[in-house]
Amino acid sequence: MKTNTNLYSPQWVSTDELPKDLYSEILPGLFMGGTHDDDVVYAKPTDKHKINSNKFDCVITMYAWANPTDWGVEEIRYGIPDSDINDANIKKLLDIAYWGYQRWLSGEKVLIRCQAGLNRSGLITSLILIMDGLFPMSAVNLIREKRTPFALFNQNYVTWLTEQARDEVKDFLESKHPSIINPTS
């Protein structure tokens, strides 16, 4: 039985528009990418391409069918469809982005990956960049400059990032560190 991946994989970008590299460095130590076609749970064991354990300290995987990373690489996994953001996902997405942000701030090399390395990984990478002080559209533009102009083509994600993410991130960070965000509290 073949699995219908329409909800999970980009259908609006042609193959020649996809990035040539599996991952790209967005800022020093912060990488965004996809998953090799043979590095999925339903591939034959001899065909697997594991994330190189020497390259990354930790990985955020947003594609449920990606194989786990190799030995010695810390990983957090949260597979979501490449479709829309709902209220139930926002807290979890912020938690995951914060996990990656904290590790990146500590000097670890962090990879955020999904299937094609365009939308879901772009969403989490954008949240990390917003947590670091970038304005949402600046985060989107930086990702498109460093990864591919077709990154974050999911308009639902871009709309949420540009209209709501900044306030969501501010509230989230304030709940984690009230004295840093609001010194009078």
Residue ranges with predicted function:
Residues 117:
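Conserved G/P- and acidic residue-centered "switch" motifs that form tight phosphate/ATP-binding loops
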Residues 114:
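Short cysteine clusters
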Residues 167-185:
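C-terminal domain-closing interface element
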Residues 120, 124-128:
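Hydrolases whose catalytic domains are alpha/beta-hydrolase-1, hotdog thioesterase
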Residues 9-110, 127-164, 169:
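Cysteine-based protein phosphatase catalytic domain of the PTP/DSP
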Residues 1-10:
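Short, basic/low-complexity N-terminal boundary segments at the transition from targeting/disordered tails
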